[in-house]
């Protein structure tokens, strides 16, 4: 399913917050877009990555926290840009309030929806890089590819297959074995 523009005029934060709870949407430059519901494979990947990252962060006993969607990230006020990454890691607690992360998370993972891959590969890549996200992964279940963008070192579009062990660059020792996740998708 492609993302649909919900209204033509630009929206305010108040209008966005007034949307019904069951509406999944993101705002880019003041324009609100509908989000498709995730697939089963999307949710399997999300759950596995979330648990792996959470367990690593707990062992580190650091200040970083991991959040799954739906949790808003307000990248800018004017024009309003609010996204809901599939997974994000935030290491600056001052960016967090009860409603959202205000500013760029340190690490974002998006799992590609079949109907609108350009949203993750182009639009969000642009917004995340410009907002100051340190690292951004695009996980594509259909193509079985993970694209790593390590903005902090200007390393872009490094692709790995689902049989790879991939290092999370912002951490010294966090490795994700995608072959284990791929096995779960085949059962």
Enumerate the predicted regions with their spans:
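Gly/Pro/Ser/Thr-rich low-complexity, intrinsically disordered segments predominantly at protein N-termini
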Residues: 1-187
């Amino acid at each position: 399913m492609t993302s649909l523009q919900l209204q033509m005029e630009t929206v305010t934060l108040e209008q966005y917050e007034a949307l019904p709870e069951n509406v999944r949407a993101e705002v880019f430059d003041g324009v609100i877009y509908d989000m498709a519901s995730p697939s089963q494979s999307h949710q399997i990947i999300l759950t596995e990555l979330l648990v792996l990252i959470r367990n690593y962060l707990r062992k580190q006993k650091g200040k970083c926290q991991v959040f799954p969607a739906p949790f808003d990230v307000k990248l800018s006020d004017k024009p309003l840009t609010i996204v809901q990454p599939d997974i994000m890691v935030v290491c600056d607690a001052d960016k967090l309030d009860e409603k959202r992360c205000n500013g760029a998370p340190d690490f974002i993972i998006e799992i590609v929806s079949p109907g609108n891959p350009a949203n993750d590969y182009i639009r969000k890549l642009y917004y995340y890089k410009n907002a100051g996200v340190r690292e951004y992964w695009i996980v594509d279940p259909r193509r079985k590819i993970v694209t790593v963008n390590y903005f902090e070192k200007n390393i872009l579009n490094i692709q790995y297959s689902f049989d790879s062990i991939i290092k999370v660059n912002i951490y010294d020792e966090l490795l994700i074995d995608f072959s284990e996740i791929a096995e779960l998708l085949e059962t």
